[in-house]
Amino acid sequence: MGMRSTTQSFQFNVPFEQLFQAASSAVQAVEKATLTRADMAGRVVTFDTPMGMMSWGENIIVGFIPGEGNTVVEITCATKGLPNLMQDGRNRAMIGRYITALSNLAGVPAVEVARS
C-alpha cells in the first residue's frame, strides 16, 4: 500500500502578500486542477484534481507562514481514494509543478526546508 498524503515545505524570500498574489495563478500549472479556496486572511489556498483513469483525484492544501521578509509555504497533496504504490511520486510531482509555477510567478527561487 502506498502513502495517502505527502507534505513538503519551501521558503520564498518575498513577503507573504506578494507571494499570495501569485498563489491562485500557480494552480494552472497542475493539470486539470480546480481552485476551491483562496483565503488571504486564513493564509490558505486549496485546489483539487478530478478522478481519472490513473488516479482517484487529489486534494491539495497550501498554507502560508509569513516571516520577516520571507514566507514558508507548506503544501500537502492527498489522494481522495485508496493510495497505490505510485501515489507518493504522483503527489511530489504535483507539488513540484505548483511550486515551480509559484516560484516563476513570484520571480524568486523556492528553497525546500522540510519534507515528509
Can you name each region flagged by the protein language model?
Residues M1-S116:
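Ser/Thr-rich, low-complexity intrinsically disordered terminal regions
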